[in-house]
Design a protein with these regions (language model features):
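RNA-binding basic/glycine-rich loop and surface signature characteristic of RAMP-family CRISPR effectors
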Residues: 1-115, 130-191
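Internal, well-folded beta-alpha domain core
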Residues: 119-120, 124-125, 141-143
Length: 191
């Protein structure tokens, strides 16, 4: 998944006095996107796609692939790992930052700062003036970053999944504000 625009993978947390919306980062400071969140996006897009093509078995296919909503019985036949940077990129960043910084530097914070940026938002009144108390700050993952995930599914579902993934163009928070434009590429790996 390549980020075509800045993206907000919200983590549901805020940093008082700094960020109203933060991004998901691992313990090393690298941003990532939850596979389970993407699975929800794919489920929604699959429902739309099957409805659009007029598939009479849409409901059964959805439940077989993704399980039944609200049901904890793990009957689904599709699995997604989290979307992460490549191990090569992560290793090179850690090596380079460690080489350049002193031993007291917060490497995780430096990594996060390299891969993300802060954006400010405000509401504008009818008079064209910023509304009082409306300033918000969000941390965004920089456009151009690529993430990788593994998808495990039944062979009979591969083509449908490929077709639907090609239709996904936006993910994350604030998509209606121009954030979250993505491009997916699929590489098959045989076992």
């Amino acid at each position: 998944m390549e980020l075509i625009s800045d993206v907000i993978f919200g983590n549901g947390m805020s940093v008082p006095g700094a960020e109203d919306t933060s991004v998901l980062c691992d313990e090393q400071g690298f941003p990532y996107y939850k596979g389970s969140t993407f699975k929800g996006v794919l489920r929604e897009e699959t429902e739309r796609y099957l409805e659009w093509i007029g598939d009479s078995e849409a409901k059964n296919k959805i439940e077989k692939m993704f399980g039944m909503g609200g049901n904890d019985n793990k009957t689904e036949q599709i699995y997604f790992s989290d979307f992460k940077l490549s191990p090569y990129v992560k290793e090179k960043m850690i090596t380079e930052i460690t080489r350049m910084e002193n031993e007291t530097a917060d490497i995780a914070e430096i990594i996060k700062e390299c891969l993300t940026n802060l954006r400010t938002f405000t509401s504008i009144s009818k008079d064209g003036v910023a509304k009082k108390g409306s300033l918000r700050i969000a941390r965004c993952v920089n456009k151009g970053v690529s993430f990788y995930s593994d998808i495990v599914c039944e062979q009979e579902q591969e083509q449908l999944i490929k077709d639907v993934i090609k239709t996904i163009k936006w993910i994350g928070t604030k998509r209606n504000r121009g954030f979250g434009r993505v491009k997916f590429s699929i590489e098959e790996v045989s076992e």
